[in-house]
Amino acid sequence: TQSRSSAASDVYKRQDGNQTDDLEKSDIILLGVSRTSKTPTSIYLANKGYKTSNIPLVNEKSIPTRITNKNFKPCIVGLTTEAERLFDIRKNRLNSLKENESTEYTNLEKIKEEVENSKKIFRKNQWPTIDVTRKSVEETAASIIKIYEIKNR
């Protein structure tokens, strides 16, 4: 962990897969499909002093290969949610942006597939996973901090 202001300024650089060249400097890396609260959780963790990055999980190719190495130091946590809840969140997001176009982003079958694929990737890499469906950002962050502390004992 580091000072809050330093962690907070770093978190903005490392959101949504930006600046993946220095992921090794992170304490925690969050992975998840779109709208699984990666960014707000990262910001919350940064305010607690944890250097946090997040990577959107589009498919297995969207993951930097070096983080799948067993000796990769940062704590990696997968975030998942129920497909139906994700469908509602994404639909509301598009409505708030005044976009009502139906796309794969809001196709329930595609979302179910996306969520299942993310779970398979998390299992394959033995990354701890948190279901954020009915959790607040604070509850999710508390679980992540516990995982981080266990990993770094």
What kind of region is each of these model predictions?
Residues 1-8, 12:
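Single conserved hydrophobic/aromatic residue that forms the stacking wall/gate
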Residues 29-46:
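Glycine-rich phosphate-binding P-loop
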Residues 14-15, 99-140:
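Small-molecule kinase domains that catalyze NTP-dependent phosphoryl transfer to phosphate-bearing small molecules
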Residues 53-55, 75-79, 128-130:
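Hydrophobic/aromatic beta-strand patches that form the interior of the parallel beta-sheet core
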Residues 13-21:
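A short, basic/flexible loop-to-alpha-helix module at the beginning of a structural domain
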Residues 52-63:
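Short beta-strand-centered segment that lines the nucleotide-binding/catalytic pocket of NTP-utilizing
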Residues 20-24, 68-71:
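Solvent-exposed alpha-helices and their adjacent loops that cap or buttress functional pockets
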Residues 74-113:
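A glycine- and Lys/Arg-enriched "phosphate-lid" helix/loop adjacent to the NTP-binding pocket
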